[in-house]
């Protein structure tokens, strides 16, 4: 309660200090000492920057306050209620794990955490987006190892699944036999007794012990290479084993006390074991089929598989590749993709804790949640990161978990696509179908921007659906271990928010037209979520680069920011980090300033040109990823310019600006040393210079070859004369299938031919 009260005070103080600054500094200077045009423009610009930064700080405090309310009010659903709800549950769930050039060991942990989820009809599908025919032996070996993972998991679980399935079936047979109506007659007084016997309870306890031992044995055999492996062993495997042993303790206690659960509860306990170890795992490669979209992004990888669900497909070979044709009779299908009520999109470097599926689906099926389309627990970071940059990036991830929980309190939830449980009926409402090359391409999750989950959140809201975050930490995901991979991730995150803003405004207008109530706080939080990176980056750039008049500085600005930093430090300690990490995060944001600016500028470029920005996946490899040289050089320039500003302000006795410049210089240099590395930064700069100097080789065709190519129709062989072939190599056979399938594809090439001559229309008739 005290934390909630202090949170309210922090919001109030931030607003009061901002108003105080506007009145005592800006308005006062305008009235008492007008400074001309330049000072007026500086004052307006500085006020705009301070206002936007203060607004973002206030939104942080507001979202944090909502999270505190949710954590206070949350009550975990008892295990028995979940078991009762899912006893005869029929709605299946498909876990989709998109993967591209991932380390097989990383993907393996993700698949295991999904496969061990307790669910009645669980399917885990690995969506491999690697090239079907890798060029190198290393890539081929990695692809083969990745594709083999689903089969390995099914094989490993087949033994315990068969045992617990047979145990459950045997229990049901014995219970039905004991409840035979013939035995329930008045002549049989024992018929009124419970059909459950101590032998049933003892066998169930033995099964729980066997399940726990199986998981513990697997944990002992698992290699522990890094902190992610340690988390997988301790939290996924041993965590589940520990919970099963807790149930075993209860069963042993019931035996000792000569107590017997009823038949329904016994069946639920049997079903739990069976469902934990039962899974249908498979893999799918969309690039094997020419009729599916090959857009290089995660959203279309998911869309390609979702579009196949619930139908049978016949594979048809053509010159353009393998095509999938829909067939109505599943018996005639070469590929049948079962449909399920729910989907779970899971990044290839994420891990789920036990109960993730059952608790979130239970939440979706609670009364009043019929229009909730997506629910998830925003992922947290793995503990014990070996590098400073991974630890600080993880700290910011943990803060985002809190903020997303708070945004749900105000109805401003955004979908974070790493581990979302989705009601399939909801995304069928927002599907867009277009015809590309004669084939229908269904887009459920928008790929217009590289933050596809954010845009889909707006689309769902426009169709009357809502989103909600589940207030527990049940999912974890890896953070980039080096600066190069972090650049890729954060540049993508900074790109796209501005492009989606018009959709948000349109949704707000439509909701007002339908006379729906829209909270101002919801719109504030949504706007801040999508646009704060833009204004915060440009605002920080102005504060660093422009020498504002010292009369605009005031201690009140520092006081307005103080509640934000204190609250952030408190949240960091709550998440298991240090209070002093607020300074490390500030330096972290300084070195990421050029990355964020690049992402924002990319958004502006896309808005002006209409071109789709390529989706760049975050590298998930064990080797260090080199960062582009520009993102390494600019942090050094920030340090140099801050030192120059410090020197000028000291000479001018502008002590406020001097202190700010010194603060920036120290933290920026610390961030370079801690997060990039002095040696690594010079290596990346050198590699950037080499990449700029060298260009890839291109095959140079001779003019003779161009002329020959221009004169020979597509699919035809070169002409020969009596002396022999036209070239040293043997003529290629005519690709008759390609000609019949594609037709004449030379029209555009003919229009661009260099040796064309324009002639009068009647010249050819003369």
For the regions a language model picked out, list residue spans one by one.
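Hydrophobic transmembrane helical bundles of polytopic secretory-pathway membrane proteins
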Residues: 1-81, 97-100, 105
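Internal catalytic domains of large membrane-associated glycosyltransferases
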Residues: 55-507
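Loop-to-transmembrane boundary segments
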Residues: 1-14, 96-98, 103, 511-534, ...
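Membrane-embedded multi-pass helical conduit in multi-pass membrane proteins
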Residues: 22-52, 526-610, 626-703
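C-terminal, non-catalytic tails of nucleotide-sugar-dependent glycosyltransferases
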Residues: 496-517, 599, 675-676
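Cytosol-/stroma-facing membrane-proximal "stalk/adaptor" domains immediately downstream
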Residues: 139, 150-151, 156-218, 668-766
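Acidic, Ser/Thr-rich low-complexity segments on the non-lumenal side of membrane proteins
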Residues: 85-129, 602-610, 703-715, 721-724, ...
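Nucleotide-sugar-dependent glycosyltransferase catalytic core
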Residues: 480-495, 582, 611-622
């Amino acid at each position: 309660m005290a934390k909630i009260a202090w949170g309210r005070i922090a919001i109030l103080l931030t607003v009061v200090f901002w108003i105080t600054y506007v009145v005592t500094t800006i308005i006062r200077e305008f009235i008492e000492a007008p400074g001309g045009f330049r000072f007026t423009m500086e004052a307006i610009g500085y006020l705009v920057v301070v206002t936007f930064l203060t607004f973002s700080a206030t939104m942080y405090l507001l979202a944090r306050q909502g999270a505190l309310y949710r954590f206070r009010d949350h009550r975990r659903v008892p295990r028995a209620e979940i078991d009762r709800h899912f006893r005869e549950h029929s709605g299946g769930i498909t876990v989709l794990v998109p993967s591209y050039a991932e380390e097989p060991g990383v993907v393996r942990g993700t698949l295991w955490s999904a496969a061990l989820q307790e669910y009645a009809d669980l399917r885990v599908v690995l969506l491999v987006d690697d090239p079907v025919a890798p060029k190198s032996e290393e890539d081929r070996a990695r692809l083969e190892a990745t594709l083999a993972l689903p089969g390995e998991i099914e094989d490993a679980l087949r033994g315990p699944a068969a045992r617990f399935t047979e145990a459950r079936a045997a229990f049901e047979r014995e219970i039905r036999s004991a409840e035979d109506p013939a035995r329930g007659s008045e002549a049989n007084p024992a018929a009124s007794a419970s059909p459950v016997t101590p032998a049933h309870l003892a066998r169930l306890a033995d099964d729980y012990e066997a399940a726990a031992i199986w998981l513990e044995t697997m944990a002992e055999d698992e290699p522990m290479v890094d902190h992610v492996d340690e988390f997988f062993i301790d939290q996924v495997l041993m965590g589940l084993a520990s919970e099963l042993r807790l149930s075993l303790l209860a069963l042993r206690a019931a035996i000792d006390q000569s107590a017997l659960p009823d038949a329904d509860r016994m069946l639920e306990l049997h079903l739990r074991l069976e469902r934990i170890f039962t899974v249908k795992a498979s893999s799918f490669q969309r690039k094997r089929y020419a009729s599916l979209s090959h857009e290089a992004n995660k959203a279309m990888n998911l869309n390609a598989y979702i579009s196949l669900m619930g139908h049978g497909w016949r594979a048809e070979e053509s010159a353009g590749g393998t095509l999938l044709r829909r067939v109505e009779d599943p018996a005639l299908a070469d590929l049948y993709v079962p449909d399920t009520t729910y989907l779970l999109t899971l990044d290839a470097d994420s891990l789920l804790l036990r109960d993730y599926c059952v608790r979130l689906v239970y939440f979706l099926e609670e009364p009043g949640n019929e229009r909730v389309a997506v629910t998830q627990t925003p992922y947290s970071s793995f503990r014990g990161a070996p590098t400073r940059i991974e630890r600080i990036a993880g700290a910011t991830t943990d803060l985002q978990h809190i903020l997303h929980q708070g945004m749900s309190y105000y109805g401003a939830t955004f979908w974070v696509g790493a581990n979302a449980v989705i009601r399939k009926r909801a995304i069928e409402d927002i599907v867009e179908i277009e015809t590309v090359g004669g084939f229908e391409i269904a887009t459920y999750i928008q790929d217009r921007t590289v933050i596809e989950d954010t845009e889909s959140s707006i689309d769902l809201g426009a169709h009357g659906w809502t989103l909600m975050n589940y207030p527990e930490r049940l999912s974890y995901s890896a953070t980039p271990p080096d600066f190069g991979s972090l650049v890729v991730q954060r540049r993508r995150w900074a790109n796209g928010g501005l492009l989606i803003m018009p959709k948000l405004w349109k949704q707000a207008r439509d909701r007002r037209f339908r006379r729906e109530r829209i909270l101002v706080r919801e719109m504030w939080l949504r706007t801040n979520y999508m646009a704060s990176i833009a204004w915060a980056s440009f605002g920080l750039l102005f504060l660093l680069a422009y020498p504002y008049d010292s009369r605009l500085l005031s201690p009140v600005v520092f006081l307005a920011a103080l509640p934000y930093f204190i609250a952030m430090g408190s949240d960091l300690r709550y998440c298991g980090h240090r209070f002093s990490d607020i300074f490390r995060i500030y330096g972290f944001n300084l070195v990421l300033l050029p990355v964020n600016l690049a992402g924002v500028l990319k958004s502006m470029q896309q808005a002006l040109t209409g071109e789709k920005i390529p989706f760049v996946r975050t590298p998930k490899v064990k080797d260090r990823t080199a960062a582009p040289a520009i993102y390494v050089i600019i942090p050094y320039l920030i340090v140099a310019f801050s030192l120059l500003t410090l020197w000028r302000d000291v000479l001018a006795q502008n002590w406020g600006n001097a202190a700010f410049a010194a603060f920036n210089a120290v933290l920026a240099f610390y961030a370079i040393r801690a997060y990039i590395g002095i040696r690594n930064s010079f290596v990346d700069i050198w590699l950037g210079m080499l990449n700029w100097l060298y260009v890839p080789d291109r095959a140079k065709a001779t003019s003779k070859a161009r002329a020959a190519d221009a004169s020979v129709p597509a699919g035809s062989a070169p002409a020969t004369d009596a002396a022999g072939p036209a070239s040293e190599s043997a003529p290629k056979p005519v690709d008759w299938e390609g000609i019949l399938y594609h037709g004449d594809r030379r029209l555009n090439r003919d229009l661009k031919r260099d040796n064309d001559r324009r002639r009068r229309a009647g010249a050819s008739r003369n």
